[in-house]
Amino acid sequence: MIPLRILAPGAALACATALAVPQDAGAPPAGDAAPAVAKAKSFDATVADAIAKGVAYLRATQEQDGSFGAPRNVMFNESFATLHTYEAWTYATTGLGAMALAECGTTAADEVALDKAVDGLLQRPLPKRVSEWDTDNVWAYVYGVQAFARLLPLERFAKDPRRPAMAARATELIAALERWQTPFGGWAYYDTDATTIPPVWTTSFTTAAAVIGLLDAEKAGLKVDPRMLNKALACVAHARLPTGAFTYNVSAVSSPEHLEFIDQVKGSLGRIQVGNVALVRGGLLDAKVVKPGLEQFFEHHRFLAVARKKPIPHESWYAVAAYFFLFGHYYASEAIELLPTDQRAPFAKQLQQKLLEIQEDDGAFWDFHISEYTRAYGTAFAVLALQRTRRATASH
């Protein structure tokens, strides 16, 4: 909606004077503004339709127990996974699905699906460490915490009888993150080097995603140990390079290494946004870094695009893995919301266009095949990103 503005007397006089002056021959006819407005509204309607189709897909593919994703249609690239790996992925994907339904759903059927997802998050056992080297359980904690942190402040849950259980489960998830925080101060999803308790291997992007979830939890009134959060923020800050890229691994010395490595800007596109959002929201970076980070994202976007749907992780240029595509776009939408209002629309439009180009006929979005989790987490990431960009353009 375009806000109506009341003109001051002086402005009204100037406006009247301007109307009396003959129109410049080189200027477009005044009527040309109407098609431009109509075109903008039409594009926004297209985005809204894409969101609705994505939400309908999530609703149609939700499991009977309210969860999203399942170990069906397994491919060779997940031959390592065990039952507990799938339990962790299910919990994380259900958290994302719940957020998508809560933020993007518009119908009574969406409300029913959201209630089922919340029940699924409450009734499922808390995922435990998968094995000595597989710590995919961390993803369950990250998106479980964020889901409850986003749901609890909503009016529809203010008097919900499940509210105490939701807060209790969120507290459990926060405690689990604290238990599995590495000596570097962050988190990852494997521990291939030391296989210790707590794990040692740490990634910048898992840590940044966890930080954002914890900041959301604080905002929702949940208790978060400031020492844990500060260590995690310092960990993400340590991984940030002068180029604006974030190293994949967190190590003693952060370095971009060789010119075609994953820690160059072109290999870091899916990590830059989540890292910047975490550090800006956590108060360790000035918000002025957000715009250059988004400019890098779109300037080099082809390196994310060419990696999408490749079946082997990191087989693409700059070792980009396919699963960074929708992850990166989701956090890019959060980065856009950190920009000054008058700078958001151009980036929002670009992000919308990139996502609209890849939506499947059934409404799903996907980037990397992981059983039935692929389209569930991908669609949740995409509709959440599109919804945020609509907010950004509406505010503009």
Which role does the model predict for each range below?
Residues 346-360:
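C-terminal closing repeat unit and adjoining cap/tail of repeat-based domains
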Residues 235:
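Active-site neighborhood of glycoside hydrolase catalytic domains
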Residues 25-56, 60, 64-113, 127-175, ...:
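An alpha-helical repeat/solenoid feature that recognizes helix-turn-helix modules
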Residues 21-23:
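Boundary of Sec targeting at the N-terminus
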Residues 111, 118-121:
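Active-site-surrounding "flap" and adjacent substrate/cofactor-binding loops of secreted or lumenal enzymes
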Residues 8-18:
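Bacterial N-terminal signal peptides
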Residues 1-3:
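N-terminal secretory signal peptides that target proteins for export/translocation
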